[in-house]
Amino acid sequence: MKTNGHFKDFAWKKCFLGASVVALLVGCSPHIIETNEVALKLNYHPASEKVQALDEKILLLRPAFQYSDNIAKEYENKFKNQTTLKVEEILQNQGYKVINVDSSDKDDFSFAQKKEGYLAVAMNGEIVLRPDPKRTIQKKSEPGLLFSTGLDKMEGVLIPAGFVKVTILEPMSGESLDSFTMDLSELDIQEKFLKTTHSSHSGGLVSTMVKGTDNSNDAIKSALNKIFASIMQEMDKKLTQRNLESYQKDAKELKNKRNR
């Protein structure tokens, strides 16, 4: 009877230990590996040839862009800063001196800036990246003690949306002389992505052996690089000396009218 009691005690402890291990393993979240293989470069080199310098100054306002929620704040800031730098480079390449205005609002021009600026360039818009609903699928992990991975997945194609509007202003009056808009949804940019997140439940035993992959951040950076290059290419075509000098008569009339 004593031997049988020891056997039962051992079996009970073994069962308890096994249950504890299972509980411990079930409580572990699966590991997600986020790839970091793409750099956010936002590069562009003006395609137009450098032209003869003019004795004219253009005021360049800071871009007033809004971004979709999946674009990180640091990417937003770099996109905005690089836009300012590259548009400045494009205008300088067209023979203009550029005065950077630390505001996106034309009402913040100083009187001196209004007086010396031939034109002003303002930019606003929405930079949006979204999954293509026709080519994106979602798979949620089902709860379970054994075979639940504990990982939810979204796999598909990231595409751009939104717009960028560029307005040419006469600084003294604040009047718009011209504008052009780029529809980002028309860009042929498609980035495959896999976004993996932890499920609302912890997953089963198999989740301890599963490693999830998430390359969605790389897809965002790659798409932003291409969007940026496309925007700058259009800027390069529109902000030429020939086009900008065509506003000279109207700009002069508006400035003189304001000075009266």
From Swiss-Prot:
UniProt KW ATP-binding keyword: no
Keywords: Cell outer membrane, Lipoprotein, Membrane, Palmitate, Signal
Chain residues carrying a lipid of type S-diacylglycerol cysteine: 28
GO CC entries: cell outer membrane
Listed InterPro entries: NeuraminylLac-bd_hemagglutn (IPR007876), NeuraminylLac-bd_hemagglutn_sf (IPR038531)
Compartment(s): Cell outer membrane
Signal listed as a keyword: yes
One Pfam entry name: NLBH
Membrane topology, record value: Lipid-anchor
Primary location class: membrane
Signal sequence, start to end: 1-27
Residues bearing a lipid moiety (N-palmitoyl cysteine): 28
Recorded superkingdom: Bacteria
Family matches, as Gene3D superfamilies: Putative neuraminyllactose-binding hemagglutinin homolog like domain
Name of the protein in its database record: Neuraminyllactose-binding hemagglutinin
Species whose genome carries this gene: Helicobacter pylori (strain J99 / ATCC 700824)
Gene label: hpaA
